[in-house]
């Protein structure tokens, strides 16, 4: 697969929920960029398509000034890049304050973050970032299993993620986590489910969102699939994993839950999973019992 190397100043990715947000590039690429399952900024041989860079503050300010001139007021603002929280705290604070100063009635300010970026910042720094106007942070938990995280080169572990998640919430910033169904493959599916539910219970994030693993020939995990070292779960198993994660959550978990991605096999949402747990599970069980899912096979691109 041919992909063109792009400048860090070119915005490529944002969460689906930020589809109608104003995108402001703060960083380019990803400071880690080693996860096997991810092809956002690299290819299957780890060739980099977009270098990691903290963009100059003057460049960021110009984007904000341009947006103000064009009348982009009253929008959510998404600070784009693989992990803008890797930027120095004062750099990030200046950007957030400038957004709030130049754009009227900003609905929210949000960004991606890595858990390690959060752990490198003090509680005081995170509180200052919150006070400057950052409302929500998106973080890829992917799995609570240390085995799965290690195999996938995630560069962190469950305990570190729990600490990072709690730091974000303690600072008053909303935390939205991503859970990647199927990431353990067939071999580690049960461990992936149990440990992910455990970590979600420990953190009790504001929101968590399910995603379904997709593997194509342009990501490193493709090699494991070809060699037989990784086996994709069947379509119905994505629903089973989701059901079992929900079923194993502790009674303290009051998170909002979303399936807001086109790659998912169903769309269910809850504004409080503690309140909606029984109905959520009932709906998933109805899908799991559907004969169409039981006979469906995952198509793998060649």
Describe the role of every protein-language-model region.
Residues 9-59:
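Canonical Radical SAM [4Fe-4S] cluster-binding loop centered on the CxxxCxxC motif
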Residues 30, 38, 79, 111, ...:
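Conserved, mostly hydrophobic/aromatic
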Residues 46-47, 146-151, 220, 266-268:
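A short acidic, helix-capping loop that chelates divalent metal ions and anchors anionic groups
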Residues 66-170:
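Conserved SAM/AdoMet-binding glycine-rich loop
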Residues 124-125, 185-202:
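Catalytic cores of alpha/beta
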């Amino acid at each position: 697969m041919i992909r063109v190397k792009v400048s860090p100043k070119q915005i490529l990715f944002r969460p689906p929920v930020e589809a109608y947000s104003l995108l402001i590039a703060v960083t380019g690429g990803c400071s880690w960029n080693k996860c096997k399952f991810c092809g956002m900024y690299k290819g299957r041989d780890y060739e980099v398509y977009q270098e990691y860079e903290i963009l100059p503050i003057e460049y960021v300010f110009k984007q904000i000034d341009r947006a103000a001139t064009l009348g982009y007021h009253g929008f959510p603002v998404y600070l784009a890049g693989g992990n803008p929280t890797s930027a120095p705290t004062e750099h990030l604070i200046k950007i957030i304050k400038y957004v709030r100063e130049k754009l009227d009635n900003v609905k929210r300010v949000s960004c991606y973050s890595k858990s390690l970026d959060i752990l490198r910042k003090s509680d005081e720094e995170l509180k200052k970032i919150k006070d400057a106007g950052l409302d929500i942070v998106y973080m890829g938990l992917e799995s609570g299993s240390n085995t799965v995280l290690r195999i996938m080169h995630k560069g962190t572990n469950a305990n570190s993620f729990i600490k990072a998640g709690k730091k974000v919430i303690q600072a008053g910033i909303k935390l939205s986590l991503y859970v990647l169904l199927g990431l353990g493959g067939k071999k580690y599916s049960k461990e992936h489910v149990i440990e992910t539910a455990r970590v979600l219970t420990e953190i009790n994030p504001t929101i968590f969102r399910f995603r379904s693993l997709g593997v194509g020939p342009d990501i490193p995990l493709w090699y494991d699939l070809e060699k037989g070292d990784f086996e994709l779960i069947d379509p119905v198993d994505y629903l089973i994993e989701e059901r079992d994660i929900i079923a194993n959550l502790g009674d303290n978990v009051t998170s909002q839950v979303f399936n807001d991605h086109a790659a998912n096999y169903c769309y269910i949402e809850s504004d409080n999973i503690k309140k909606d747990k029984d109905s959520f599970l009932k709906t998933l069980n109805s899908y799991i019992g559907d004969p169409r899912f039981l006979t469906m096979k995952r198509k793998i691109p060649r």
